[in-house]
């Protein structure tokens, strides 16, 4: 038995390339785990660099130098971003304030509706449970004002941090696009020599991350616009705010769609009650979600490695718990990394590719 264990260990853990891969993965994990907060601007710049690499490379192919291509792409991207912010942000902010001010009315209406449930469905709903839920919601709402004040005070520091990020991220993004090859060569020089296996995993992961980031941004935009059109046509309150939330919800696979459905349903109930308009909007909303999951995602992520839904959910929970927002955003690529490492892990010695 001991001999079998020793043979298994020699096959899988004595290869210099395996040791190099383990060192690289461990170093990357420690850096992200302990310094993810400090590195947030760099991570944001890397994500945007993946997104903008394609148009930059296209401009290079038609004759632009790399610095000029990076500059043109960055200027166009900044213009589109500023336009979207100045058009969308004021309306979203106003609708958010209106939603907060309407919360007491929504709670009272929901409470009145819930009080009728025990008499309408006595076998299914208990009056005591309804009262307990209503009291719990009321206590949560009463503490909302205090929470908003705390958030407002904390946001002063957040605004300063945001201002710094608005300077750092574009600068980092420009140099990541402009000096891509020089930076990759610098990274290669500090990596272990026996990195053939790590290079094999990186080639697969680099393409996966590229496809994932581009696909996820497109999915956010398409789902957000489609949802807004549905809400706007139906005349739903807070249409733009809710559509933006639905668009961002695609960042969290499965879980995000469930969470964002709650405010959509509550606002629709408050506005129309359980009537024809409510059911029309709810069905249209489900159609958008269904088209996203069954049509849009397969098209945008056709080149991604297939992962079981349970694996994706666990990845969101685990990596989100370790790295917060970035762990959630990169949950699928990180799960794919684990899968790629397992598949590439050698049982026999692999000659160094360098």
Question: Positions of the model-derived regions?
Answer:
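Anchoring transmembrane alpha helix of integral membrane proteins
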Residues: 1-94, 173, 335-354
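Juxtamembrane membrane-interface segments in integral membrane proteins
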Residues: 3-5, 15, 19, 55-62, ...
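Short, amphipathic, aromatic/basic-enriched membrane-interface segments that mark the entry/exit
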Residues: 6-17, 137-140, 210-215, 232-234, ...
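Alpha-helical transmembrane segments and their immediate interhelical loop/hinge regions
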Residues: 16-17, 155-269, 275-281
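Generic alpha-helical transmembrane segments of integral inner-membrane proteins
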Residues: 22-27, 31, 43, 71-84, ...
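Transmembrane helix boundary and interhelical junction motifs in multipass membrane proteins
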Residues: 39-43, 225-226, 236-266, 294-295, ...
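Membrane-interface starts of transmembrane alpha-helices
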Residues: 65-73, 126, 130-133, 195-199, ...
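Hydrophobic alpha-helical transmembrane segments of membrane transport and translocation systems
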Residues: 278-354
């Amino acid at each position: 038995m001991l001999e079998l264990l020793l043979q298994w260990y020699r096959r899988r853990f004595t290869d210099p390339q395996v040791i190099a891969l383990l060192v690289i993965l461990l170093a990357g994990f420690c850096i992200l785990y302990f310094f993810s907060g400090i590195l947030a601007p760099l991570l944001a710049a890397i994500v945007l660099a993946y997104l903008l690499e394609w148009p930059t490379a296209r401009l290079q192919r038609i004759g632009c130098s790399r610095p000029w291509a990076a500059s043109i792409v960055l200027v166009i991207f900044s213009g589109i971003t500023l336009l979207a912010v100045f058009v969308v942000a004021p309306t979203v902010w106003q609708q958010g304030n209106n939603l907060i001010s309407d919360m007491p009315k929504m709670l009272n209406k929901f409470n009145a509706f819930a009080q009728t449930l025990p008499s309408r469905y006595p076998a299914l709903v208990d009056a005591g449970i309804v009262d307990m839920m209503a009291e719990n919601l009321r206590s949560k709402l009463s503490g909302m004002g205090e929470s908003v004040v705390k958030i407002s005070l904390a946001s002063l520091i957040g605004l300063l941090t945001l201002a710094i990020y608005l300077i750092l991220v574009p600068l980092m993004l420009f140099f990541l696009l402009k000096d891509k090859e020089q930076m990759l060569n610098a990274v290669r020089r500090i990596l272990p020599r026996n990195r053939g296996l790590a290079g094999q995993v990186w080639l697969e992961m680099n393409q996966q991350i590229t496809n994932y980031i581009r696909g996820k941004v497109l999915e956010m935009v398409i789902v957000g616009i489609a949802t807004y059109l549905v809400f706007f046509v139906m005349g739903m309150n807070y249409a733009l705010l809710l559509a933006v939330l639905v668009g961002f919800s695609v960042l969290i696979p499965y879980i995000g769609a469930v969470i964002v459905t709650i405010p959509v349903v509550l606002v629709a109930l408050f506005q129309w009650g359980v009537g024809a308009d409510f059911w029309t909007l709810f069905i249209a909303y489900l159609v958008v979600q269904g088209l996203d999951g069954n049509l849009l995602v397969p098209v945008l992520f056709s080149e991604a490695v297939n992962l079981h839904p349970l694996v994706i959910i666990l990845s969101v929970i685990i990596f989100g718990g370790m790295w917060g927002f970035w762990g959630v955003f990169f949950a699928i690529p990180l799960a794919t990394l684990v899968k790629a490492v397992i598949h590439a892990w050698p049982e026999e010695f692999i000659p160094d590719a360098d």
